[in-house]
């Protein structure tokens, strides 16, 4: 292998490593603020390309009461920043936000 090939290979390796380091340092967090006048009973999020919501992220014991907030780390192994979110209220109504770039937007006020 000649010197040019070695330098090119090292450059490619450095770019690959720096790209994965950037993905790991992205902030996938979002603060969900309940401004609905009622309680959020279930909260779901998924990568934008997913066809289903997955599991309730609040679990069995937790809710988000009116005027309360909850932080969620939305990194779930998918490096894309695009997430869909759904909040289901105790009344059965739901609110959705689709195609949110959670690496840039870090708050959702649910109304």
Model regions: which residues?
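Extracellular beta-sheet/turn segments enriched in Thr/Pro/Gly and aliphatic residues
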Residues: 93-111
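Asparagine-centered strand-capping/turn motif at beta-strand->loop junctions
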Residues: 30-37
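Intrinsically disordered, low-complexity Pro/Gly/Ser/Thr-rich segments with frequent PxxP/GP/PP motifs
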Residues: 53-77
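Sec/Tat signal peptide C-region and signal peptidase I cleavage site
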Residues: 19-23
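A short, solvent-exposed beta-strand micro-motif common in secreted/extracellular proteins
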Residues: 80-89
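Bacterial N-terminal signal peptides that target proteins for export
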Residues: 1-8
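Short acidic/proline- and small/hydrophobic-mixed sequence motifs that coincide with surface turns
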Residues: 38-42
